[in-house]
Amino acid sequence: YPPKPENPGEDAPPEELAKYYTALRHYINLITRQRY
């Protein structure tokens, strides 16, 4: 499995949060695609 993205935390700037959520969505898609 690819590594899970690091949570930037509550105090992260909006750009970091957006990047994190994009990476997280991509990560979840990769994992769910591999499972089926």
Swiss-Prot record:
Give the UniProt keywords, A-Z: Amidation, Hormone, Secreted
A Pfam match is Hormone_3
Which GO molecular function annotations are given, in alphabetical order? neuropeptide hormone activity; neuropeptide Y receptor binding
Q: Which CDD domains match?
A: PAH
What GO terms in the biological process aspect are recorded for it? Answer: feeding behavior; neuropeptide signaling pathway
Q: Which residues form the signal peptide?
A: none
Q: Where in the cell is it found?
A: Secreted
Q: A GO CC term?
A: extracellular space
Name this polypeptide is given: Peptide YY-like
* Annotated family: Belongs to the NPY family.
What is the scientific name of the source organism? Oncorhynchus kisutch
What top-level branch of life does the organism fall under?
Eukaryota
Q: Which residues carry this modification: Tyrosine amide?
A: 36
